[in-house]
From Swiss-Prot:
Function: One of the primary rRNA binding proteins, it binds directly to 16S rRNA where it nucleates assembly of the head domain of the 30S subunit.
Gene Ontology cellular component annotations, sorted alphabetically: chloroplast; small ribosomal subunit
Complex and partners: Part of the 30S ribosomal subunit.
CDD domains per record: uS7_Chloroplast
Family named by the database record: Belongs to the universal ribosomal protein uS7 family.
Domain of life (superkingdom): Eukaryota
Protein name: Small ribosomal subunit protein uS7c
Keywords assigned by UniProt, alphabetized: Chloroplast, Plastid, Ribonucleoprotein, Ribosomal protein, RNA-binding, rRNA-binding
GO biological processes: translation
């Protein structure tokens, strides 16, 4: 047995302007090459664009989008008897939020558009409405889990 203690679970800090953890999680995922100030600029511009498009609280749109994209279940490859099965597993809330943010950013990067702030704001508004590539990704994951339900006992 290890003599070391268990590592404390880190909680996400909140960002300086909105005091919101989800915004900070988004910033940390969008971050490239250590340029955090640029990541903050992109997020804050996207939030302003959401405010202009929807004329509602942009943080509620962000929360609604992330809640809509967060998966309940996913599939994990598991090797059993020489063949690999896709085994459906339940996902916790923290991991689900992380996946949702990753999917939202991936879908917004693939969008055609002027800049990342514009693409991200469009994807967040679409996800809050229940459409967009990130919602499709979640539904595809749920379909895969449903199709492989027979392998659920391999956990």
């Amino acid at each position: 047995m290890s003599r070391r203690g268990t590592a404390e679970e880190k909680t996400a800090k909140s960002d300086p302007i909105y005091r919101n953890r989800l915004v900070n999680m988004l910033v940390n995922r969008i971050l490239k090459h250590g340029k955090k100030s640029l990541a903050y600029q992109i997020i804050y511009r996207a939030v302003k664009k959401i405010q202009q498009k929807t004329e509602t609280n942009p943080l509620s749109v962000l929360r609604q989008a992330i809640r809509g994209v967060t998966p309940d279940i996913a599939v994990k490859a598991r090797r059993v008897g020489g063949s690999t099965h896709q085994v459906p597993i339940e996902i916790g809330s923290t991991q689900g939020k992380a996946l949702a943010i990753r999917w939202l950013l991936g879908a917004s990067r693939k969008r055609p558009g002027r800049n990342m702030a514009f693409k991200l704001s469009s994807e967040l508004v679409d996800a809050a409405k229940g459409s967009g590539d990130s919602i499709r990704k979640k539904e595809e994951t749920h379909r895969m889990a449903e199709a492989n339900r027979a392998f659920a006992h391999f956990r």
